[in-house]
């Protein structure tokens, strides 16, 4: 606190000093009106084109420097709070410049840093850690910072709870560390297991006691529908093979389709979690499938598979460029396959969340017209949910049909 | 400064939607043309059109992804 007082004193001194001598120009070379003149900038300092911008720049610089020194993200509420304590929302250029230079020159030992991150602040998790007097210890600095900005962090959490992207957060349910690896059981794993359990249960119910009843019940119809659908897809898309060889690929494709279908549809249940809205999952799927398809291609054609990269009948001078282009487009398939699914799922769910948040807020505005008018957004949300259900099925289908097309390319070498 | 630039960048990324709009319009206008010429193929063509629609829409979503990257990653 004493240091803070000193610092404020120094800042005030600097301020008076610059205000007294600022009759020529500031550091940027922009003339500042002489005190006593009736210049418009003096009457309305906010109008000065250079000053306002530079103040913001310096304040951002201080925040950046603080985030570096505190070893935290620049957007972190604690960093923002500490930076605000340091510059105190001042619009005095010289004062801000002095602070920034102090931070740059002395780092964690600087007056400004100590003022922004007080060492003697009470810690939430117990007493002061040892060695807090030095203020150079990494863990210590972080802890002090976290306690200093704790109020603001709470406020920010409350505000952040409204973000439409919150629904995609991965939270650990069981914390697990094996060696250095973090292998917690998260809500992502839970919902993936749920999907798997659901699919397996469905198949188990249908095939119980031999299954295959002549008159199918609802579950058997569903499974038969999915099976028929994928079988037709494989038969139509993959050509040039006898039925037996073709059907070696069928189980893999069927499982991919079923898994994606159930993941996507499960995500449409309110308050559940969409597994396929993470490119961790979709890219893992698409890359492994892509590698598998490439292996199949090499297995069937050996090194002749490289002729895939050169379309037939291309003039020789064009060949190098075309090979490069084809190679890029071939590799990009893996990426686009995963990102398409991920982006569709994420965009759809965020959209529904944003619009339903809008309808929810409108409902409680205590105004009868808004209350009745809320039917509009409500119906839009309803329609979008229907659209999302369609997209969930469609994207599983698109993913599967693209696998079939790529597999066909690898087998028949266009 | 950086915040403002981010917002401008994210807004500019949505310009890509123009292309996707043209693409989706093209897919369905072609579907209507084709079905008008040969109504008996309607069912088969609709399947292709839906596939084309999904692929075109995905391009628009790449733009959305860029906007998110600009806003939240950098």
Swiss-Prot record, chain B:
User: Any transmembrane segments, and where?
Assistant: 8-28, 53-73
**Record GO cellular component, one term:** mitochondrion
Q: Does the keyword Ion transport apply?
A: yes
Site location (Reversibly protonated during proton transport): 57
Question: Which CDD domains does the record associate with it?
Answer: ATP-synt_Fo_c_ATP5G3
Localization terms from the record: Mitochondrion membrane
Q: How does it sit in the membrane?
A: Multi-pass membrane protein
Question: Which is one GO molecular function term here?
Answer: lipid binding
The GO annotation for biological process reads:
proton motive force-driven ATP synthesis
Q: Which UniProt keywords apply?
A: ATP-binding, CF(0), Hydrogen ion transport, Ion transport, Lipid-binding, Membrane, Mitochondrion, Nucleotide-binding, Transmembrane, Transmembrane helix, Transport
Family the UniProt entry places it in? Belongs to the ATPase C chain family.
Q: What does the UniProt function comment say about this protein?
A: This protein is one of the chains of the nonenzymatic membrane component (F0) of mitochondrial ATPase.
Q: How does it assemble?
A: F-type ATPases have 2 components, CF(1) - the catalytic core - and CF(0) - the membrane proton channel. CF(1) has five subunits: alpha(3), beta(3), gamma(1), delta(1), epsilon(1). CF(0) has three main subunits: a, b and c.
Record's protein name: ATP synthase subunit 9, mitochondrial
The organism encoding this protein is Oryza sativa subsp. indica (Rice)
What is this organism's lineage? Eukaryota, Viridiplantae, Streptophyta, Embryophyta, Tracheophyta
């Amino acid at each position: 606190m004493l240091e803070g007082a000193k610092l404020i004193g120094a800042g005030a001194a600097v301020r008076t000093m610059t205000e007294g001598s600022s009759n020529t120009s500031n550091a940027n070379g922009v003339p500042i009106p002489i005190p006593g003149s009736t210049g418009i900038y003096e009457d309305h300092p906010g109008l000065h084109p250079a000053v306002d911008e530079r103040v913001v720049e310096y304040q951002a610089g201080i925040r950046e420097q603080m985030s570096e020194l505190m070893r935290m993200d620049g957007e972190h509420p604690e960093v923002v709070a500490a930076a605000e304590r340091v510059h105190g929302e001042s619009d005095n250029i010289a004062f801000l410049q002095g602070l920034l230079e102090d931070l740059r020159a002395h780092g964690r030992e600087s007056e400004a840093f100590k003022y922004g991150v007080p060492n003697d602040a009470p810690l939430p998790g117990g007493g002061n850690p040892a060695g807090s007097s030095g203020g150079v210890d990494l863990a210590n600095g972080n802890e002090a910072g976290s306690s200093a900005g704790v109020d603001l962090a709470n406020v920010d959490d409350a505000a952040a709870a409204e973000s439409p992207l919150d629904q995609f957060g991965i939270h650990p349910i069981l914390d697990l560390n094996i060696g250095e690896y973090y292998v917690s059981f998260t809500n992502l794993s839970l919902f993936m297991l749920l999907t798997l359990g659901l699919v397996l249960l469905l198949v188990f119910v249908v095939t119980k006691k031999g299954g295959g009843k002549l008159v199918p019940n609802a579950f058997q119809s569903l499974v038969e529908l999915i099976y028929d659908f994928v079988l037709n897809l494989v038969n139509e898309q993959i050509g040039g093979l006898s039925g037996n060889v073709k059907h070696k690929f069928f189980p893999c494709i069927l499982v991919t389709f079923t898994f994606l279908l159930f993941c996507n549809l499960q995500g449409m249940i309110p308050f559940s979690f969409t597994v396929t809205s993470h490119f961790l999952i979709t890219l893992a799927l698409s890359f492994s499938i892509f590698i598998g398809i490439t292996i199949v291609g090499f297995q069937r054609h050996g090194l002749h598979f490289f002729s895939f990269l050169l379309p037939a009948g291309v003039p020789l001078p064009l060949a190098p460029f075309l090979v490069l282009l084809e190679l890029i487009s071939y590799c990009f398939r893996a990426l686009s396959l995963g990102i398409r699914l991920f982006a569709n799922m994420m965009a759809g769910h965020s959209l529904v969340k944003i619009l339903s948040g809008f309808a929810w807020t409108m409902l409680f505005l205590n105004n009868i017209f808004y209350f009745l008018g809320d039917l509009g957004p409500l119906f839009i949300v309803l329609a979008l949910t229907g659209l999302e259900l369609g997209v969930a099925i469609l994207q599983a289908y698109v993913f599967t049909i693209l696998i079939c097309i790529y597999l066909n390319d690898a087998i028949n070498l266009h | 400064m950086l915040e403002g630039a981010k917002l401008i960048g994210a807004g500019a990324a949505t310009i890509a939607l123009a292309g996707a709009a043209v693409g989706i319009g093209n897919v369905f206008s072609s579907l209507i043309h084709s079905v008008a010429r040969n109504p008996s193929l309607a069912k088969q063509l609709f399947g292709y059109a839906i596939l084309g629609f999904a692929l075109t829409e995905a391009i628009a979503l790449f733009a959305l992804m860029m906007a998110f990257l600009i806003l939240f990653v950098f």
